[in-house]
């Protein structure tokens, strides 16, 4: 109601604005007319005056009128724009709700192109988890000194928000590695000049150069370090065709990059590799000639596409996902189906048909009414619909008017070439029942068929047993038994039309059936209507040759484009269907000419690369989520992370709307993913991270190895690179309790007993902590209350220790310094010291082949020429369009 009232108010405001504009215009037009009359009188009275002045006045009046019209137009446009912008959301909602033709095809195309753009990756730097950071040193009283020291720190040292844990930190760290894991490493391409090299040497990448510059500019860097930096340079071996580049890396980063260098995904590239990428069927197609002019040297490399077949089985049990995928395939395929050209003129064809029939006035009127929807656009729509629906294995439905016998005859042709398994069951039954009760049974003098709901057999299967006419019964038998063939080409299942349909011979059966049907008596129909139906059927049978050519054209374009499909084709019913008007089928049959159209080579390779990119991304995301499931299971996060993992996987496939997928399908997807083995590289990377888990924990500024609890306040200790802090790195003389044992047993008596005996204890285990530099918080000793709730609620996950730092950079530091206070605390963070950065021990020599060149988008090196469309031949060696 609110939206309606708002709409009414806006409409009333707009009407009032328009009325005001009209009154203003009328007044100004009247004034202009009066002024024109006065000017005319002046001109007539002063006939001997200057004529040029009168012309200038009239020109000025015309200019004023034009300006006035422009102003009015601008005002109207502005008001229209304001109305549209104010109600834009409401307009979109109404369009989406009530207009069936509203779709998001442009959005699907955009997402498919995003996959294409993300497939080509370039790597300019090495993979890194750590970076050296400069840290200032502090005096024993907490004052900053000019001295500095360098430590290794994590590049991405962030814990997940909310109910976080260290295990989730390692899972997010592993996911970061999976996202940035390189397919290949070309050291020669990413190498940069060492600005301090004495011999114009190079180092491995820009990040190493940044570290050198920061280290060199540090005034505390000693001379022997600067001399060492000037000696860093690459080494080339001409005998082995390799180059070694110095890289400044943390030991874990060095291990990861060495692994990536040894397990690159690139392969040698030759013209043979490119030729093998072309589908065999296209390569041997006589209508296309492929030339590869580029010559590739022995150092050429490429990343092969990841074309493993569907390991999940989206067609089996994932109705929502399968529907989205097939619709995206349908939208994508329609872009590459050629447009029909030089069709017969629609108006001319309708006139010729009416003249040929020579019917009475009432019959001609009925005919023209039935033929009114024939157009070239509708014919093109039907052509793309038939090919696109089979390419994408979409379920189809035909919309028709039962009394329109021309449409029903067109539907008969569609069922002649399209198996019943691709039709929506309800649409198929309605269409067959209309054909039987409107054409077949009245022609043969049989009673109307009464089809019962829930009948397993189709109307055609029931009619086949009752029809005695041989030609009609053979056609019904063909429709009832027609199925797509399944052909396996290079491990991919493709749907294929039968040989009779591919050669167009099936149209002879269709034509014979039409002739037999038109020669029947139609005893129950009036004479005029009977003659109209008979001549319409004869009109279609007269175009047998053109319809046969049309069939060959459809099959050739489909078969050629289907060679570019790289995923198995499964004909499974979809939730939504693609719909076609029967009038469009009539347009296609009546307007088809002898002009042959075949897919352009650029369209073929665009369609091929689009399918390759989708399947490659699909397999990559499967490997990622399987590795993530394995990592979550190993880190004991399996239960709480599962649904989120699967949802993120679906969203990364671009064309699926993850929130709209029912939960039962998501859990079924989880079960399928659990049974897929982990890819080798991803498993090895996880092993490397877990083997260095302690080292990563020490480097992190968010994770400590435990916490010290004491009933008696203890003074803060002095650490050289921090100042005064409550951090200990030695467990001697302290009682140690394992946090994991407390979580398993739930026995908190050891903590309470130790605190009551005034014995400091260390709860050992990796836990997150926060840092606080406020002096007031330390002096108030509020940290004791943090652990009271832990013992009370018996929940160790609430353990969040605070690391206090007090130095000259802290707030209120001079409050402590001037009053000579000694800050104390009852808790201390147990944390190992971070690894100190030493450039002499952090330089690794990475070796790579010297002159590798990686090529992307290999299809651009293929030059394709085609024969003239009129000379194009089908797979039987004959021309596609034989009636030329």
From Swiss-Prot:
InterPro entries in UniProt: Rotavirus_VP2 (IPR007779)
Places the protein is found: Virion
Gene Ontology terms for molecular function: RNA binding
Keyword annotations of the record: Capsid protein, Inner capsid protein, RNA-binding, T=2 icosahedral capsid protein, Virion
Keyword RNA-binding among UniProt keywords: yes
Keyword DNA repair: no
GO cellular component terms attached to this protein's record: T=2 icosahedral viral capsid; viral inner capsid; viral nucleocapsid
Tree of life domain: Viruses
Quaternary structure (record): Homodecamer; each decamer is made up of two conformers of VP2, called VP2A and VP2B. Interacts with a VP1-VP3 complex. Interacts with the intermediate capsid protein VP6. Interacts with NSP5. Interacts (via N-terminus) with NSP2.
Assigned protein family: Belongs to the rotavirus VP2 family.
Cited function: Inner capsid protein that self-assembles to form an icosahedral capsid with a T=2 symmetry, which consists of 120 copies of VP2, with channels at each of its five-fold vertices. This capsid constitutes the innermost concentric layer of the viral mature particle. It encapsidates the polymerase VP1, the capping enzyme VP3 and the genomic dsRNA, thereby defining the core.
Protein name: Inner capsid protein VP2
Lineage: Viruses, Riboviria, Orthornavirae, Duplornaviricota, Resentoviricetes
């Amino acid at each position: 109601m609110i939206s309606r009232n708002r709409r009414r108010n806006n409409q009333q405001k707009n009407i009032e604005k328009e009325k005001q504009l009209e009154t203003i215009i009328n007044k100004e037009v009247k004034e202009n007319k009066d002024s024109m009359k006065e000017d005319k009188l002046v001109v007539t009275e002063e006939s001997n005056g200057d004529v040029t002045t009168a012309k200038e006045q009239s020109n000025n009046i015309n200019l004023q009128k034009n300006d006035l019209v422009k102003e009015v137009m601008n005002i109207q446009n502005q008001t229209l724009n304001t109305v549209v912008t104010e109600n834009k959301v409401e307009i979109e909602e109404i369009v989406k709700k009530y207009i069936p033709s509203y779709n998001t095809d442009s959005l699907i195309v955009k997402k498919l192109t995003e996959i294409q753009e993300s497939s080509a990756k370039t790597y300019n730097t090495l993979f890194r988890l750590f970076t050296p950071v400069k840290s200032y040193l502090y005096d024993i009283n907490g004052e900053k000194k000019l001295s500095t020291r360098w430590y290794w720190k994590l590049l991405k040292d962030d814990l997940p928000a909310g109910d976080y844990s260290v295990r989730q930190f390692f899972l997010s760290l592993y996911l970061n590695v999976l996202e940035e894991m390189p397919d290949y490493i070309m050291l020669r391409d990413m190498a940069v000049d060492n600005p301090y090299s004495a011999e114009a040497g190079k180092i491995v990448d820009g990040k190493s150069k940044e570290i050198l510059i920061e280290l060199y500019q540090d005034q505390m860097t000693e001379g022997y370090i600067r001399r060492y930096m000037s000696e860093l340079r690459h080494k080339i071996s001409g005998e082995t065709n390799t180059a070694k580049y110095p890289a400044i890396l943390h030991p874990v980063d060095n291990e990861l990059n060495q692994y990536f260098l040894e397990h690159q995904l690139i392969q040698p590239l030759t013209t043979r590799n490119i030729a093998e990428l072309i589908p065999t069927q296209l390569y041997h197609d006589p209508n296309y000639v492929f030339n590869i002019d580029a010559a590739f040297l022995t150092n050429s490399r490429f990343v092969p596409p990841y074309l493993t077949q569907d390991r999940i089985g989206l067609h089996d049990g994932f109705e929502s996902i399968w529907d989205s995928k097939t619709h995206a395939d349908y939208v994508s395929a329609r872009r590459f189906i050629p447009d029909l050209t030089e069709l017969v003129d629609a108006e001319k064809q309708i006139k010729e048909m009416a003249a040929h029939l020579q019917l009475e006035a009432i019959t001609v009127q009925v005919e023209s009414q039935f033929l009114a929807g024939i157009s070239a656009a509708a014919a093109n729509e039907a052509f793309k619909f038939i090919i696109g629906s089979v390419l994408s294995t979409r379920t189809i439905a035909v919309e028709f008017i039962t009394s329109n016998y021309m449409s029903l005859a067109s539907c008969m042709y569609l069922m002649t070439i399209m198996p019943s398994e691709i039709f929506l069951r309800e649409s198929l039954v309605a269409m067959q029942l209309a054909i039987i009760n409107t054409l077949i049974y009245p022609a043969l003098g049989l009673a109307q068929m009464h089809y019962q709901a829930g009948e397993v057999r189709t109307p055609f299967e029931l009619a086949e047993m009752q029809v005695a006419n041989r030609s009609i019964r053979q056609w019904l038998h063909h429709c009832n038994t027609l199925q797509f063939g399944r052909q396996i080409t290079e491990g991919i299942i493709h749907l294929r039309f039968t040989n009779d349909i591919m050669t167009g011979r099936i149209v002879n059966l269709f034509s014979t059936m039409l002739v037999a049907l038109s020669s029947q008596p139609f005893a129950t129909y009036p004479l005029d209507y009977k003659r109209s139906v008979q001549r319409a059927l004869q009109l279609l049978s007269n175009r047998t040759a053109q319809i046969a050519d049309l069939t060959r054209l459809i099959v050739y374009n489909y078969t050629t484009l289907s060679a570019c499909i790289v995923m198995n084709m499964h004909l499974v019913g979809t939730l939504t269907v693609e719909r076609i008007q029967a009038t469009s089928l009539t347009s296609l049959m009546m307007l088809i000419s002898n002009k042959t159209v075949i897919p352009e080579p650029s369209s073929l390779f665009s369609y091929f690369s689009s399918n390759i990119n989708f399947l490659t991304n699909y397999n990559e995301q499967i490997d990622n989520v399987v590795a993530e499931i394995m990592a979550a299971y190993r880190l004991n996060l399996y239960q709480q992370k599962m649904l989120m993992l699967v949802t993120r996987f679906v969203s990364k496939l671009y064309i699926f709307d993850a929130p709209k997928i029912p939960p039962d399908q998501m859990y079924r997807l989880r079960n399928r993913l659990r049974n897929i083995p982990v890819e080798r590289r991803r498993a090895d990377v996880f092993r490397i991270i877990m083997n260095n888990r302690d080292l990563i924990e020490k480097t992190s500024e968010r994770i400590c190895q435990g916490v010290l609890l004491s009933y008696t306040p203890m003074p803060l200790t002095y650490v050289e690179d921090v100042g005064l802090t409550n951090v200990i790195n030695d467990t001697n003389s302290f009682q140690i309790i394992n946090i994991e044992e407390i979580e398993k047993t739930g026995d908190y008596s050891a903590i309470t007993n130790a605190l009551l005996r005034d014995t400091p204890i260390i709860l050992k285990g990796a836990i997150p902590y926060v840092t606080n530099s406020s002096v007031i918080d330390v002096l108030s000793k509020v940290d004791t209350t943090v652990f009271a709730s832990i013992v009370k609620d018996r929940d160790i996950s609430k353990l969040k220790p605070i690391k206090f730092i007090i130095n000259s950079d802290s707030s209120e530091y001079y409050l402590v310094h001037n009053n000579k206070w000694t800050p104390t605390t009852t808790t201390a963070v147990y944390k190992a010291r971070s690894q100190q950065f030493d450039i002499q021990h952090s330089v690794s020599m990475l070796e790579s082949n010297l002159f590798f060149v990686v090529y992307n988008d290999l299809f651009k090196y293929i030059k394709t020429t085609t024969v003239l469309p009129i000379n194009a031949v089908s797979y039987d060696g004959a021309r596609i369009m034989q009636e030329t």
